[in-house]
């Protein structure tokens, strides 16, 4: 399913004529340029590879520069792929430009981003563990996780045990966000609700897979 690459600008709110307020995320979607068409005969699957933005050539390795020169497309800030079916792959070609007109008839979208990294966190912040007693004999164990296993049997800590560790900085998908407004002149799309990641982060926008209630 074809999508677009955008950049999260931040959040705001808009009011309807009836006075209803909606929190929305503003996403800037600049020109997406197709750099490669992947086919089953050569790559064992159908996909469209795109780039967006402009990047200086001295920031790239020679193989990366050669990839852009071969496609005849301006060097972008990254490469992203969208897997497609055999029938829809013929609608695209190398060098083609894509914009928000792709979503002109779409009501809901799925958005993929990278969540905010929080660094190393304890179990209270990371997994919402309950803290131990503030007093009543407790010393230096107010935010300790407690027991992490049993005895000689099984004699190990089970995989997946909720413990302290790195929080955030994961690929996160938010599904079924309503498209509130599309402005082709300013190259922005407003979607209802929050989107993962920092302002300025790259966002993948796709038509919603689960179109419940549409």
Swiss-Prot record:
Pfam families: Ribosomal_L3 (PF00297). GO terms for cellular component: cytosolic large ribosomal subunit. PROSITE patterns: RIBOSOMAL_L3. The keyword Membrane does not apply. One of its GO terms (molecular function) is structural constituent of ribosome. Gene3D superfamilies: 3.30.160.810, Translation factors. It comes from the Bacteria. GO terms for biological process: translation. Methylated by PrmB. The modification N5-methylglutamine is found at residue 152. Residues 134-153 are annotated as: Disordered. Keywords: Methylation, Ribonucleoprotein, Ribosomal protein, RNA-binding, rRNA-binding. InterPro entries: Ribosomal_uL3, Ribosomal_uL3_bac/org-type, Ribosomal_uL3_CS, Transl_B-barrel_sf. Part of the 50S ribosomal subunit. Forms a cluster with proteins L14 and L19. One of the primary rRNA binding proteins, it binds directly near the 3'-end of the 23S rRNA, where it nucleates assembly of the 50S subunit. PANTHER family: 50S RIBOSOMAL PROTEIN L3, LARGE RIBOSOMAL SUBUNIT PROTEIN UL3C. Belongs to the universal ribosomal protein uL3 family. This is Large ribosomal subunit protein uL3. It comes from Buchnera aphidicola subsp. Baizongia pistaciae (strain Bp).
């Amino acid at each position: 399913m074809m999508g677009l690459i955008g950049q999260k600008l931040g959040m705001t709110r808009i009011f309807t004529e009836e006075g209803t307020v909606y929190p929305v995320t503003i996403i800037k979607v600049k020109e997406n340029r197709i750099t490669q068409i992947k086919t089953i005969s050569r790559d064992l699957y159908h996909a469209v590879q795109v780039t967006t933005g402009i990047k200086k050539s001295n920031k790239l390795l020679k193989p990366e520069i050669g990839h852009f020169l071969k496609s005849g497309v301006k060097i972008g800030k990254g490469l992203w792929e969208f897997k497609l079916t055999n029938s829809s792959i013929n609608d695209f070609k190398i060098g083609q430009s894509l914009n928000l007109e792709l979503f002109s008839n779409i009501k809901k979208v799925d958005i993929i981003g990278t969540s905010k990294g929080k660094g190393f966190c304890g179990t209270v912040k990371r997994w919402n563990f309950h803290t131990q007693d503030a007093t009543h004999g407790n010393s230096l164990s107010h935010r300790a996780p407690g027991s992490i296993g049993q005895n000689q049997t099984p004699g190990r800590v089970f995989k997946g045990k909720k413990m302290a560790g790195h929080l955030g900085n994961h690929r996160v998908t938010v599904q079924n966000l309503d498209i509130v407004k599309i402005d082709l002149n300013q190259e922005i799309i407003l979607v209802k609700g929050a989107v993962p990641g920092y302002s300025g982060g790259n966002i993948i926008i796709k038509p919603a897979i689960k179109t419940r209630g549409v």
